[in-house]
């Protein structure tokens, strides 16, 4: 359940399960009492989970807990962290914990293990910007180590084999934590791609995964493999599963995860009902119990896989029934209706829903756009024709009585009654209602 969690991570795992209301009442009570017992041992009760721990345990109010705190916590209770840093993590004062870690002077032989701990804290508080910086630094470190190996063999021989190996293992674990970061961000393609790139470039990757991942008391081997499994199933197109499962470079990894191979084979053979029994059964249980898997699983991963199969049926069918899909896939009818309707609307797919039936519409989205543009064009042309007619009528009026709109009314009347050919400029100005001082119409 807690994958051997120690230190602050134990409280995080217990608090997570209680927060999502997971488990039976007696289980939850037992977890809560275990959490409170740990808090008393490390002399720290300032955790955001304290209220729910007390509520689920049925123990005394929060204010009475501190009276039981005595002695100094044993280092084994701190999860490899300094006492003050462990308390900061328990209190969710993550930024202060990271600051303290970054401010410490660390022996050269422990620098990568130290960076490993900083990466763990950054993951707990989802400081993905900080993790990006760590990823950049790790790339430079790895490149520097390669150059060092090529140019400085004497120095390499001087350093003990154990130190070199510990550094290599720490760097690989940090890179695995980067995969965890991608998963938490729901970047499933990046998660599995990063891991498979590690496998091809770092021969020790699978050794560290199988033998040296659990030792950091953060994420278990089973949880990490499940992250990769889910990322593969979601990211790789349905049509490419058949090629993927036979990749020779991944043969060793497939041996570590028969569950993934089984799922791929079921999907390749379109045995979706059996696949979803595993997806909603064994895989769902593992994810819901995990601090690192549950958030992305509940937020997107579970439904993305279902939508992937819905889309497969839409692609090969012109007419579908919700009830048929429900019985074929073994998924609740109401869930299918809600998810498939959202898929059609958000994807602007050419399907129309009529009760229990989904029909394919022959007209494409492009054709709908063309039709709309054509209708708009007709309306615009009608407006233009109307304006043209109004302008023509106005022109006819002006041409029929051109002097009606010249100057003032009196001037127009006078000029209209007498021929302008018989007048000179002075005479016209004399007859105008507008004086010279006002700038007469015919002033020279």
Curated annotation (Swiss-Prot):
GO terms for biological process: adaptation of signaling pathway by response to pheromone involved in conjugation with cellular fusion; protein deneddylation; regulation of protein neddylation. Signal peptide: none annotated. Residues 195-367 form the PCI domain. One of its GO terms (cellular component) is nucleus. Keywords: Cytoplasm, Nucleus, Signalosome. It comes from the Eukaryota. SMART domains: PINT. Residues 419-439 are annotated as: Disordered. It is found in: Cytoplasm; Nucleus. Component of the COP9 signalosome (CSN) complex that acts as an regulator of the ubiquitin (Ubl) conjugation pathway by mediating the deneddylation of the cullin subunit of SCF-type E3 ubiquitin-protein ligase complexes The CSN complex is involved in the regulation of the mating pheromone response. PCI8 may also be involved in transcriptional and translational control. Component of a COP9 signalosome-like (CSN) complex, composed of RRI1/CSN5, CSN9, RRI2/CSN10, PCI8/CSN11, CSN12 and CSI1. Interacts with PRT1 and RPG1, 2 subunits of the core complex of translation initiation factor 3 (eIF3). Present with 504 molecules/cell in log phase SD medium. This is Cop9 signalosome complex subunit 11. It comes from Saccharomyces cerevisiae (strain ATCC 204508 / S288c).
């Amino acid at each position: 359940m807690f994958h051997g969690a120690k230190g602050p991570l134990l409280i995080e795992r217990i608090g997570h399960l209680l927060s999502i209301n997971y488990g039976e009442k007696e289980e939850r009570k037992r977890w809560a009492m275990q959490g409170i017992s740990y808090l008393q041992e490390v002399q720290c009760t300032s955790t955001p989970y304290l209220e729910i721990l007390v509520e689920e345990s049925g123990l005394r109010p929060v204010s009475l807990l501190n009276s039981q705190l005595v002695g100094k916590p044993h280092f084994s209770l701190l999860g490899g962290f300094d006492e003050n840093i462990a308390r900061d993590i328990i209190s969710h004062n993550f930024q202060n914990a990271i600051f303290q870690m970054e401010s410490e002077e660390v022996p050269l032989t422990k620098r990568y293990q130290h960076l490993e701990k900083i990466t763990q804290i950054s993951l707990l508080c989802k400081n993905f910007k900080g993790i990006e910086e760590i990823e950049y630094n790790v790339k430079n470190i790895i490149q520097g180590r390669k150059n060092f190996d090529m140019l400085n063999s004497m120095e390499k021989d001087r350093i003990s084999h154990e130190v070199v190996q510990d550094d290599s293992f720490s760097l690989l674990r940090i890179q695995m934590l980067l995969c965890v970061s991608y998963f938490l961000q729901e970047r499933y393609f990046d998660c599995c791609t990063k891991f498979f790139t590690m496998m091809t470039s770092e021969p020790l990757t699978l050794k560290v995964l199988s033998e040296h991942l659990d030792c950091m008391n953060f994420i278990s081997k089973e949880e990490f493999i499940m992250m990769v499994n889910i990322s593969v199933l979601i990211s790789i197109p349905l049509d490419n599963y058949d090629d993927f499962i036979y990749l020779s470079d991944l043969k060793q990894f497939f041996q570590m995860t028969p569950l993934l191979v089984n799922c791929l084979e079921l999907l390749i053979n379109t045995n979706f009902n059996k696949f979803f029994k595993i997806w909603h059964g064994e895989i769902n249980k593992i994810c819901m119990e995990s601090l690192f898997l549950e958030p992305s699983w509940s937020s997107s991963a579970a439904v993305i896989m279902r939508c992937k199969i819905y889309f497969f049926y839409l692609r090969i069918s012109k007419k579908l029934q919700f009830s048929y899909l429900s019985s074929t896939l073994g998924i609740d009818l109401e869930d299918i209706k809600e998810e498939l309707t959202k898929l059609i609307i958000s994807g602007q797919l050419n399907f129309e829903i009529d009760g229990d039936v989904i029909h394919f519409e022959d007209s494409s989205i492009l054709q709908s756009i063309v039709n709309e543009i054509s209708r708009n064009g007709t309306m615009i042309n009608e407006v233009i024709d109307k304006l043209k007619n109004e302008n023509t009528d106005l022109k006819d009026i002006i041409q029929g009585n051109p002097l009606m709109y010249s100057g003032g009314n009196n001037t127009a009347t006078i000029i209209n009654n007498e021929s302008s050919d018989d007048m000179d400029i002075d005479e016209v100005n004399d007859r105008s209602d507008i004086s010279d001082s006002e700038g007469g119409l015919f002033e020279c």
